[in-house]
Amino acid sequence: MFIYVDESGSFVPATRSDSWCVVAGYVVPEVVRKHVERSLSLLKRRVGCAYQNELKLRHLSESQLGRFLGELGDLESTLFISAIDLGHQDPQVVFAHQRKQVDSIRANRPNMLYEEGRASIDDLSGRLERLSPQLYTQMVAQVDLLDQVFRMATLYYAQRLPATLGSFKWRMDEKNSARPLFEQTLTHMAPALIQAKSLREPGISVEGFDHSHFDKCFRM
């Protein structure tokens, strides 16, 4: 499967409610990827947008958007969203949450037998500590999204297109590559946070669903 991830919003603290910021992941089985790309190409052509340019919502009429969503709805693709209203978040609580994560990483330093391990702890905790509050908030939302995809997409496609679970190919928003601290911190933090959550809240496996492709590629 291909998972296209993008965000909307600045993730900065807000003084009023309805200040939503969103990270979304659109999951496309490889067998229908060309159909999705064709629908997007036709939509851009209809509104006069060059294929290499990003299409914004303001470029579309309601009918054009409805038609495009209808085309996507006919495919076995799925959409996952992690959203947060910054108008209801206390900046001090966000800071405390970030501080707690940093401290929890550093707590493992004495357990490292070798200098390489201690250096890795120092590097990761330092990266996390240097994230701005808005990038930390975005990272938390993005990790939540990735966890959703792993938990729910596996259940969905194990019933419909089991072979889709043999590969997860992520396509992140290119803006993240211009923010190396964010991208590198997310890359290092996401696997550990998702694993920790799976230990606290194990994912669901349903007897009779076909997980064979997933198990073959990812089970130890």
Can you describe what each PLM-predicted range is?
Residues 1-78:
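An N-terminal structural lobe/cap that precedes and organizes the functional/catalytic core
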Residues 83-220:
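A two-mode feature
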